[in-house]
């Protein structure tokens, strides 16, 4: 049994052990009220659960069905990645290249559209959303890109527009009686700008039409690039989040930054020596956080900036199962000190994605990050994130009663 779960079970047992005493009913009622107040203070700030591409661990990503399932499983927000079609519509796809997430490669009528394109400095072959009208996109069907995940829903669901995602979320908000929001990402803004299909104005127009173009709307806008967030900060009061990537983790736990994924692509094309000298890692320094705080509400770092991993000589199994956890960094505390929230990505259930310390149980990973003070998590498995949050609430309630 892992340490976080052992601790929770011990605290749970303690909660139900009646302590002896001779207090009056009034005293007991007062103490009970005080405990309740403390518990409420402890539980009032809980991390957001963001359905990463919807419930993408179970259904083909970025479909209305995946978003709806994430909401049913308890997501506070769902995340549509946005790319543009040839005729300027915003659709939910993880990349402009749709070869891996749709059935386009099996459609003979579109065979001539296959080509090589350069996206953020990397050449890739496939089919690109900007070569298709929305009407053509609507004839395609989504598929699950990861082979270890359920494949039986391939070919069943269409590709939604941003407006359709917003309509779904608004309907679910009414059905569930709780606030549900969207967390759109502007994918490859520099790439889309070069195509004459800029994303920012189209996104803000859709939010305005939905009544969501304001600070208190249930919306976060995220991007890996910096200049488009700065531009957005001058056009909208919607909360903005600076994503922070890295390419890999080295054996010693340090993060690897390999071109062209070593920095925001708008830095790469800027030609500015001071930006070309930086990597994404700069954004996690005190100076970088101070800079981000000038235009953004928060940061969205890869979780390895918060808890990295190192090679485990005794580790076995695939992927990260062969690695163990490094000591947590102080990024969350420093970001909070700079006035920024922290929403980390991506949390997944598969064994190959869990370092050995978690003993094969993804709940343990969530609990660690929750206990470190994370403000939100992007999860492929919303239900697991929500269960872990319930355990966090229990832990806080027990701790408050023990005060």
What are these regions (language model features)?
Residues 1-9:
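Bacterial N-terminal signal peptides that target proteins for export
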Residues 22-403:
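Phosphate-group recognition and catalysis centered on beta-loop-alpha active-site segments
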């Amino acid at each position: 049994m892992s340490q976080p779960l052992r601790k929770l079970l011990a605290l749970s047992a303690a909660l139900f052990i009646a302590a002896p005493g001779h207090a009056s009913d009034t005293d007991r009622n007062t103490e009970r009220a005080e405990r309740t107040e403390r518990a409420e203070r402890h539980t009032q700030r809980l991390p957001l659960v963001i359905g990463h591409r919807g419930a993408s661990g179970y259904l083909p990503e970025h479909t209305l069905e995946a978003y709806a399932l994430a909401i049913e499983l308890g997501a506070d927000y769902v995340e549509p990645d946005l790319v543009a079609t040839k005729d300027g519509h915003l659709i939910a796809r993880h990349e402009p290249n749709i070869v891996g997430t749709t059935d386009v490669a099996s459609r003979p009528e579109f065979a001539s559209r296959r080509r090589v394109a350069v996206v953020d400095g990397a050449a890739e072959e496939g089919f690109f959303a900007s070569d298709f009208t929305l009407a053509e996109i609507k004839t395609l069907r989504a598929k699950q890109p990861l082979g270890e995940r359920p494949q039986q829903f391939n070919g069943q669901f269409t590709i939604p527009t941003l407006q359709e995602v917003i309509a779904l979320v608004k309907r679910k908000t009414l059905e569930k009686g709780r606030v549900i929001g969207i967390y759109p990402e502007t994918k490859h803004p520099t790439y889309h700008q070069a195509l004459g299909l800029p994303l920012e104005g189209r996104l803000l127009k859709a939010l305005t039409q939905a009544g969501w173009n304001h600070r208190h709307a249930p919306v976060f806008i995220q991007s890996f690039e910096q200049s488009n967030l700065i531009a957005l900060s001058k056009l909208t009061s919607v909360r903005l989040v600076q994503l922070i990537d890295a390419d890999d983790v080295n054996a010693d736990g340090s993060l690897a930054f390999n071109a062209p994924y070593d920095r925001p692509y708008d830095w790469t094309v800027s030609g500015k020596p001071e930006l070309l000298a930086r990597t994404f890692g700069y954004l996690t320094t005190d100076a970088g956080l101070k800079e981000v705080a000038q235009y953004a509400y928060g940061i969205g770092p890869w979780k390895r900036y918060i808890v990295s991993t190192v090679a485990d000589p005794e580790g076995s199994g695939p992927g990260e199962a062969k690695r163990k956890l490094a000591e947590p960094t102080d990024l969350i505390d420093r970001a909070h000190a700079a006035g920024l929230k922290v929403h980390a990505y991506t949390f997944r259930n598969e064994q190959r994605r869990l370092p050995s310390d978690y003993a094969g149980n993804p709940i343990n990973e969530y609990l660690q990050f929750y206990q470190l003070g994370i403000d939100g998590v992007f999860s492929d498995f919303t239900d697991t994130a929500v269960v872990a949050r319930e355990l966090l609430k229990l832990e806080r309630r027990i701790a408050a009663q023990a005060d």
